[in-house]
C-alpha cells in the first residue's frame, strides 16, 4: 500500500476515534451532571440520598471541575472541601471491609459537601433560567 494512502487512512481513523471518545465523554458528563442536579437540586430528595451520593459528587468534581462554570468563591470552597473529604476518607479505618463506627470529621465534611452540592445546583438552575 502506498505510504501516503496508508498515513491518510491512519489520520482519518485516528480523528474519527478521538472524536468518538470525546463524544462519549460529553455524553457521560451531561448524564452525570443531570443526575447530580436531580439529587442535589430537587428539594423532594431526602438527605440520606444526598449523603449516599457524596462520593459520586466528589468524583464528578474531580473529573470535570474544569468544565463547570462556577464562581471563584464556589470553586475555592469546592476544592477545599474535596481536599478535606479525601484526607478524612484516607484516615478511615476499615474493619472487615467496612468503616469503623464513630468519627466526627468525615460526617461533618460530608454535611458541608451536601450543602455545597445544593448551593451549586441552585446556582446552576439560576443560570439556566437567566439564559
Curated annotation (Swiss-Prot):
Main subcellular location of this protein, as a coarse class: secreted
Offer a single GO CC term for the protein. extracellular space
Q: What does this protein do?
A: A humoral factor that may play a role in stress tolerance. Requires Mekk1 expression in the fat body to regulate response to septic injury and consequent immune response.
Record keywords: Immunity, Innate immunity, Secreted, Signal
The name of this protein is Protein Turandot M
Protein family per UniProt = Belongs to the Turandot family.
Location in the cell reads:
Secreted
Name the lineage: Eukaryota, Metazoa, Ecdysozoa, Arthropoda, Hexapoda
Recorded superkingdom: Eukaryota
Do you know which Pfam families this protein is assigned to?
Turandot
Single GO BP term: cellular response to heat
User: What InterPro entries does the entry give?
Assistant: Turandot
Which N-terminal stretch is annotated as signal sequence? 1-23
Amino acid at each position: 500500500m502506498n505510504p501516503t494512502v496508508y498515513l491518510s487512512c491512519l489520520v482519518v481513523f485516528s480523528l474519527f476515534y478521538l472524536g468518538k471518545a470525546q463524544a462519549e465523554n460529553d455524553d457521560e458528563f451531561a448524564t452525570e451532571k443531570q443526575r447530580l442536579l436531580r439529587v442535589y437540586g430537587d428539594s423532594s430528595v431526602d438527605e440520606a440520598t444526598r449523603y449516599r451520593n457524596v462520593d459520586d459528587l466528589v468524583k464528578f468534581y474531580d473529573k470535570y471541575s474544569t468544565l463547570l462554570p462556577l464562581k471563584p468563591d464556589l470553586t475555592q470552597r469546592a476544592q477545599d472541601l474535596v481536599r478535606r473529604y479525601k484526607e478524612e476518607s484516607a484516615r478511615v479505618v476499615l474493619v472487615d471491609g467496612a468503616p469503623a463506627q464513630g468519627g466526627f470529621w468525615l460526617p461533618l465534611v460530608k454535611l458541608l459537601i451536601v450543602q455545597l452540592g445544593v448551593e451549586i445546583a441552585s446556582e446552576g438552575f439560576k443560570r439556566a433560567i437567566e439564559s
